[in-house]
Amino acid sequence: MMSYIKQPHYAVNGLTLAGTGMDLLHSAVGYPTTPRKQRRERTTFTRAQLDILEALFAKTRYPDIFMREEVALKINLPESRVQVWFKNRRAKCRQQQQQSTGQAKPRPAKKKTSPARETNSEASTNGQYSPPPPGTAVTPSSTASATVSIWSPASISPIPDPLSAATTPCMQRSAGYPMTYSQAPAYTQSYGGSSSYFTGLDCGSYLSPMHPQLSAPGATLSPIATPTMGSHLSQSPASLSAQGYGASSLGFTSVDCLDYKDQTASWKLNFNATDCLDYKDQSSWKFQVL
């Protein structure tokens, strides 16, 4: 087992991957020994060579291949050096022309750039805050006054107070709405007066708006339309004999449903006979917190 582990490296094309094999592999590959030339040697021209080149440059700035070869033979230099000299000479000539034009016309160049700056400055000043005319300055105040007038109490029609509306006679419907639109105990409290309260009164118009509010699911209780209450209550569409209170809505059973006229009985509506005072006496009103 140990001999299997200590076996030499596998051979790749007859060469192991050990250090000697890698050396043989590298030695088989040929690398260039001479380094690459980084830059050309700088050519120095003599005065005679420069005179010949300048004479040709005065004739033409772009000599063809034949002219360059002829000049190269005269000055004893390769044609590529002559081509590079003409290239550099044209660049030097363009630079001299730009410098001469820049020195001759410095002010027009500045004038060309100054209008752009002036326009930018004008645009920046225009972008700043400019005082609006007096007519537009009143706009925020007018809008503020409009909003104030919207929320001012004078512009809103006063909402009728339920308590003040209750001072009107009981025949008007506005007096009965704040009391009878509440839950069932409040409704019975509004009718909790003695039976003589309904005598001689036409309560048909008073109870007719309560027709949809008095309907409740559940078994109906004993009718409260008594002879002392008059025929108007029994014949009104809101007669409680047809609608009735649900046993589940008021939280008491049929055993607790005593006679409506019997005020001395133990009513389960959290008030006694002393609380059922005259409807018009506002000082004796007692509202139950629901």
Curated annotation (Swiss-Prot):
SUPFAM superfamilies: Homeodomain-like (SSF46689)
Gene Ontology MF annotations: DNA binding; DNA-binding transcription factor activity, RNA polymerase II-specific
GO terms of biological process kind: anterior/posterior pattern specification; eye photoreceptor cell fate commitment; positive regulation of transcription by RNA polymerase II
Compartments, as annotated in UniProt: Nucleus
Keywords for this protein: Developmental protein, Differentiation, DNA-binding, Homeobox, Nucleus, Transcription, Transcription regulation
Region (Disordered): 93-144
Cross-referenced InterPro entries: HD (IPR001356), Homeobox_CS (IPR017970), Homeodomain-like_sf (IPR009057), Otx_TF (IPR003025), Otx_TF_C (IPR013851)
Keyword Nucleus: yes
Residues that span the membrane, as ranges: none
Pfam families reported for this sequence: Homeodomain (PF00046), TF_Otx (PF03529)
Task of the protein: Transcription factor involved in anterior and eye development. Promotes the differentiation of both rod and cone photoreceptors cells in the retina. Together with other retinal homeobox proteins, acts as an effector of a cellular clock which, depending on cell cycle progression, establishes the generation of distinct retinal neuronal cell types. Acts synergistically with nrl to activate the rhodopsin promoter. Promotes the formation of anterior regions and represses the formation of posterior structures during development.
Name of the protein in its database record: Homeobox protein otx5
Source organism per UniProt: Xenopus tropicalis (Western clawed frog)
Lineage: Eukaryota, Metazoa, Chordata, Craniata, Vertebrata
